[in-house]
């Protein structure tokens, strides 16, 4: 029986939602992830230190007492965020980053930033205190094709930010294009990126060919196969600039299977198992541990986890759905087989 033991991984980008959904989302993310960067796009969003810390308390309350999972909190940036709020958040030791959502770019992003120039005093403060900037890298101009919005964002917004703030650590989250891979590779060492399991395993054909599959619909949207191959090459390259971030984003079943369905794919039920499948297919299982367990912690300036988990190559069938609050969430690979499972 083939097995793989790796240092306990972390998830550097996950959505847990709020309220009674936390009982289910925290259960899934805390099964074997040591830490996770928690997205702040709630309703209303966690725009200040106090709301982020209150959200952290609700997450901690939802996990079992013996579970050592640690939520790492994030501020939601708006046009009204102040440099003083950044300093206050950093001083807590519990808020590790601030998130740039271009207004309207994704779920619950209507309060996001309308112009990057509005943020420059805040970005200066972040660079001073050592707080990371997390970026949803898409423009929201409706005249820009949805498949081009990441590329245009890199060219028109992020390139200038990287130039203007050489001491600011920036994570370009859930990258989806060869353009983003090239951008990060050419950028200085203060720029890195997360890559999701579903963008490694799937491309837009999986979502659109032979019928629309709404559970593959996420933002940034799945791209063509050539971009998928660039992501696989980046993730398995051994470059410290790329690390695990699931962007697992739960939506109730009827909100996905709808005439105007929500964007987001749920992968927290089997995150490391999905990554293992992608890395094995690329002949790079030996690169999984660093991608999942080392590079993210190193970039954030946090210690690596010291304990381990073990995966075994034993196929199992993913349930058709999982409980979410008083409803159900349909995960990636629902009703299908997965090759790997965590056994300890």
From Swiss-Prot:
Transmembrane segments: none
One record GO biological process: 'de novo' pyrimidine nucleobase biosynthetic process
Keyword field: Hydrolase, Metal-binding, Pyrimidine biosynthesis, Zinc
Pfam families linked: Amidohydro_1
Sites where the protein binds Zn(2+) 2: 99, 136, 174
InterPro entries: Amidohydro-rel, DHOdimr, Dihydroorotase_CS, Metal_Hydrolase
Gene Ontology cellular-component terms listed: cytosol
EC number(s) reported in the record: 3.5.2.3
Pathway assigned in UniProt: Pyrimidine metabolism; UMP biosynthesis via de novo pathway; (S)-dihydroorotate from bicarbonate: step 3/3
Active site (catalytic residues): 247
Cofactor(s) required for function per UniProt: Zn(2+)
Domain of life per record: Bacteria
Keyword Zinc attached: yes
Catalytic activity: (S)-dihydroorotate + H2O = N-carbamoyl-L-aspartate + H(+)
Entry binding sites for substrate: 15-17, 41, 136, 219, 251, 263
MF terms in GO: dihydroorotase activity; zinc ion binding
Positions carrying N6-carboxylysine: 99
Cofactor binding remark: Binds 2 Zn(2+) ions per subunit.
Signal peptide: none
Residues at which Zn(2+) 1 binds: 13, 15, 99, 247
Family: Belongs to the metallo-dependent hydrolases superfamily. DHOase family. Class II DHOase subfamily.
Functional description taken from the UniProt entry: Catalyzes the reversible cyclization of carbamoyl aspartate to dihydroorotate.
HAMAP family: PyrC_classII (MF_00219)
Subunit structure: Homodimer.
NCBIfam families named in the record: pyrC_dimer
Protein name, entry field: Dihydroorotase
Organism annotation: Shewanella denitrificans (strain OS217 / ATCC BAA-1090 / DSM 15013)
Gene name of this polypeptide: pyrC
